[in-house]
A protein has these predicted regions:
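Residues lining the SAM
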Residues: 104-107, 131
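Short N-terminal helix/helix-N-cap motif within the alpha/beta-hydrolase-1
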Residues: 111-115, 140
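A short glycine-rich, Lys/Arg-flanked "PGG" loop and its adjoining helix->strand segment in the class I
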Residues: 114-129
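Residue-level signal for the nucleotide or nucleotide-sugar donor/cofactor binding architecture
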Residues: 108-111, 160
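A structural helix-start
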Residues: 24, 71, 110-111, 136
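Conserved N-terminal segment of class I S-adenosyl-L-methionine
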Residues: 1-94, 100, 104, 117, ...
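Conserved class I S-adenosyl-L-methionine
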Residues: 129-156
């Protein structure tokens, strides 16, 4: 798709392993806050995995349904109390069935990416919310033999920077907002020491600037007919 796997990552079988979905109660708070800020009340969670994010949102009074192609994942999500549906190339919902559709850390794993996006925008009334790993600085990081931890999944088939993600979503939406998030602070070597906390305060105050962001957050509005 956008950036080739070969040009971005070293593919070693003993390092890169398939990623697993978050378990209930182990969701990443920034993703939940992102959805809370932008989503409507009714939400379809595509690629829901074990349902960690839908369950967290349901606890915040959102009406969520989880969809996935993996029946084992859906079984665990349903056992946790999440309404679920097995999905295929065509989603089993009428046009505009949900206020929002979310795909959190999903589309980088999907070979037929445009097909699932077409369906996501079809069943959404308001918007489609997407998060993906940010690939814009991977080559620079690779030169120093490092990468973001969540890039170590062997089942990533697409890699996005802000421009390529906006171009892709622009095929389905006239209003796309892309934000970089989850900054990487270059002081891992002093982790949890007094220096670590002091440097972190300086970054939060804006006195020091970070140049690396590990995730992209996208809000794409549904086109009006």
């Amino acid at each position: 798709m956008v950036l080739s796997i070969e040009s971005m990552l070293r593919t070693k079988d003993d390092v890169y392993q398939p990623g697993l979905p978050a378990k209930p109660g182990e969701h990443y708070g920034a993703l939940v806050r992102f959805v809370e800020q932008h989503a409507g009340n009714s939400i379809l969670d595509l690629g829901c995995g074990y349902g960690a994010y839908s369950l967290a949102l349901a606890a915040r009074d959102r009406q969520c349904i989880g969809g996935d192609i993996n029946l084992a994942y859906l079984t665990k999500a349903a056992a946790s109390g999440l309404p679920v549906v097995s999905i295929g190339p065509v989603l089993p919902f009428a046009d505009g069935s949900f206020d929002s559709v979310i795909l959190l850390e999903v589309i980088e794993h999907v070979p037929q990416i445009e097909a699932i996006l077409k369906e996501a925008f079809r069943v959404a009334r308001r918007n489609v919310l997407i998060t993906v790993p940010n690939s814009e600085n991977l080559e620079l990081l690779q030169q120093n033999d490092v990468t973001y931890g969540h890039m170590l999944s062997s089942d990533h088939v697409h890699f996005f920077d802000p421009d390529s993600l906006k171009t892709l979503l622009g095929r389905f939406s006239n209003a796309v907002e892309i934000h970089r998030g989850d900054p990487i602070y270059p002081f891992w070597f002093v982790s949890r020491s007094p220096a670590y906390y002091g440097l972190r305060v300086l970054y939060r105050l804006g006195l020091l600037k970070t140049h690396f962001y590990s995730r992209l957050y996208a809000v794409a509005s549904v086109r009006e007919n």
